[in-house]
């Protein structure tokens, strides 16, 4: 499963280019979308990005709610430590804003995959059936966990050459043993050609070793 976060005005073009490359390989994308990013960008005010998301979702890519205000690196991850009542307020606001824009999803991924116990506890009452964390994929209606560590480029994680090489090796090991591969990249990093190529190369390695592409909707 490949996911992309931080798609907004300045990153939409490189994200679209990366997605076209993967689409040619039959790889769908899970789009991690929040109504706000860094407190400065607002999906409601960006009609072009909304249309981009609508077209991609209609074509088979997935929408995953990525918080209320996805913070830039340096700030604490939004849902990492929230107690249940605060998580409920933020999630309720995020769901309402996204639904007003015509987007709905039963899947939640907190920024940087850091999910507090309080957040996990309130997700079912808000209609979510899946939650994604650093540990894996939480199936909420059965209270089970599909263990699968997320491999991330950017968004608070590494993006250097050695880190990208480490991720490719991890993808290869997981694919060889038939495990679940979760690969994510920030669209901020797709602006950089070398980083985009290395992430695409990691996807190619997984495909060559028999990994079956899917989105989080299909788990």
Per-range role (PLM):
Residues 1-59, 196:
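Active-site beta->alpha N-cap acidic-glycine motif
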Residues 2-4, 29-31, 63-66, 105-108, ...:
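Hydrophobic faces of well-ordered beta-strands that scaffold small-molecule active sites
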Residues 5-7, 34-38, 68-70, 113, ...:
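Active-site beta-loop-alpha junctions enriched in small/polar residues
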Residues 13-18, 44-56, 133-143, 159-173:
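Alpha-helical scaffolding within the catalytic cores
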Residues 26, 30, 185-219:
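C-terminal domain-boundary segment and adjacent tail
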Residues 40, 72-83:
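Surface-exposed, active-site-proximal loop segments in enzymatic domains
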Residues 81-155, 191-197:
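Catalytic domains of cell-wall/extracellular-matrix polysaccharide-remodeling enzymes
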Residues 144-194:
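A conserved mid-domain beta-alpha-beta active-site/ligand-binding segment of alpha/beta enzyme cores
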């Amino acid at each position: 499963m490949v996911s992309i976060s931080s798609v907004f005005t300045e990153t939409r073009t490189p994200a679209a280019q990366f997605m076209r490359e993967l689409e040619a390989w039959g790889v769908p994308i899970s789009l991690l979308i929040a109504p706000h990013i860094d407190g400065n960008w607002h999906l409601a005010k960006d009609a072009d990005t909304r249309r981009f998301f609508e077209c991609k979702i209609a074509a088979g890519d997935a929408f995953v709610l990525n918080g209320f205000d996805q913070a830039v690196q340096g700030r604490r991850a939004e849902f990492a430590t929230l107690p249940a009542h605060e998580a409920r307020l933020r999630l309720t606001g995020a769901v309402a804003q996204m639904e007003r824009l015509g987007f709905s999803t039963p899947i939640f991924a907190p920024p940087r995959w850091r999910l507090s116990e309080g957040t996990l506890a309130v997700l079912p009452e808000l209609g979510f059936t899946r939650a994604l964390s650093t540990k894996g994929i939480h199936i909420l209606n059965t209270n089970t966990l599909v263990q699968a560590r997320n491999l991330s480029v950017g968004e608070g994680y590494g993006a250097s050459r050695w880190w990208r090489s480490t991720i490719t090796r991890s993808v290869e090991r997981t694919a060889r043993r038939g495990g679940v591969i979760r690969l994510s990249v920030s669209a901020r990093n797709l602006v950089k050609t070398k980083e985009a190529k290395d992430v695409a190369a990691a996807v190619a390695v997984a495909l060559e070793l028999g990994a079956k592409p899917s989105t989080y909707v299909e788990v």
